[in-house]
Amino acid sequence: MDTVSIQVIARMRSDFATKFGIPRQSGLVESLRSTIVFEPEFRNPDALRGIEDFSHLWIIWQFSEAVRQGWSPTVRPPRLGGNTRMGVFATRSPFRPNNLGLSSIRLLGVEQTREFGTVLHVGGADLMDGTPIFDIKPYIPYGDCHTDATGGFTDTAGDFLLNVSFPPALLSLLPEDKRDAAIGVLSHDPRPSYQRSPERVYGLSFAGYDIRFTVKENVLTVREVLKK
């Protein structure tokens, strides 16, 4: 089998310390804020010349938490309730031969920093903190937007959105600039498809806080917010 080597050019800095709760697709929670920090050998600002003229980017990255688990020819997509198997190449499962992810994200700004050189501030990313990034490309509407596209099983899959009950006293414990994103993440039902007990208390690690919640029917209720 042929093999190739590939370099990590950057890492994502995000509010997700673990993979639990990360949106299942990029762009679902636009209020999420993250930063792309380049590795030292790729901090030449010339490599980013002109990138500020694009509103969105494609990033190619590694499902680093799935590498140890290998790949499977069939997987159970969460949007099908975790009960139906589909071919891995017909899904976006992390359990792939090369563990590569592809995300479309919004470019919010380009900043020159003293410590890390030029960094990219982005919105709507679905990556864990520290995720390795292999490449960045501009999103080009005339070539990347297919108005006649069909979405396979995702076109008919159910809506996983939940109503979030976040008591004001608990919400106020989060930094103001993280509140909308936290609610957005919770509304997309972070629970695994195989864990849906209304009695279970779940914990979401987000932005340095442990957000504990329960779910009954279609309502997610936050029970506790703890600073880590």
Description of each model-found segment:
Residues 13, 105-108:
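Conserved positions in beta-strands of structured domains
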Residues 1-100, 112-228:
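Mixed-charge, low-complexity intrinsically disordered regions
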